[in-house]
Structure formats: C-alpha cells, structure tokens
C-alpha cells in the first residue's frame, strides 16, 4: 500500500467517524425530544391535544429509528474501512 492510499483510507475513516459522532449527537437530542413528548402526552388534559402529541410522538419515533439505522450503516462502513486499513498495513 502506498502512502497516498493509506492517507486516503485515513481520511475516509476520519470522515466516517465525524459522521457517526454527529449522528450520535442528533440521536441524543431526538431521544430527549421523544421523552419530552412522552411527558407531555401523560400530562395532556384535552383529548385533541393528546391526540396531536401522540401523532408527533409516532413521527419522532420513526425519525429516531431512521437516524439509528443511519448510524448503524455508517458504523458498518467504518469497520470495513478499518479492516481494510489493518489488512493493508500488515502487508
């Protein structure tokens, strides 16, 4: 492996690491929002408000699942690149 190829893999690795960290930050905030919606639903007095909050909650849960899946996908890519790098440096 040339120095340029190794450098390219290191850049990809760093970019993926940054994406994963950003997704984790986003996921943490979304989980917090989800918990706040749960509390709002529990405290809602009027049925129409409760229904609207429940719809928001369902949407938020879907968004959380999507971001979580993205994080998994990027983590898998990161692991593949890490394995490639390790194999290349062993040669």
Predicted region positions:
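Compositionally biased non-globular segments, especially hydrophobic aliphatic-rich helices
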Residues: 43-47, 78, 91
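Short, charge/polar-rich alpha-helical segments
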Residues: 1-31
